[in-house]
Amino acid sequence: MKVHATKGHAAAKARAGKVHAIDRDTLTLLLEMGKSSWPNEYMVLLGAEEGVINMVYPIAGSGGGSDASYIMMDMVPLGMSFVGTAHSHPNGVVRPSDTDYSTFAETGQVHIIVGSPFDEYSWRAFGRDGHPVKLEIVSEE
């Protein structure tokens, strides 16, 4: 699977601060997006508050096909902060591709891959270096 972010303006930036969890509703949304975009990939940016991923940012002009997805970083709103990306692998393989590794290094600290069958067991999180990271699933009130 090929995933890439096109270079954009410097005003859109990855936010610092340790991400340790993902909101259950946000995870459910990412999985549902995978189902609805199947057999194509999708890619979005992720936002967080107090270390919990709880925002999904679809970016205008971004897209995906059966073996690739991309984000148009020059379309990210000025001043918007994000902590990473999420994208789907319709074939169900929730491991980073070679292209994913370069995207991870350029676009934040946490990257989520969801895969078919898009259930609570078919996703993984990775750090900038492509190594798996553990995210707690929490319910925000």
Language-model region placement:
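Conserved beta-strand-loop surface patch within small alpha/beta domains used
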Residues: M1-F82, N91-E141
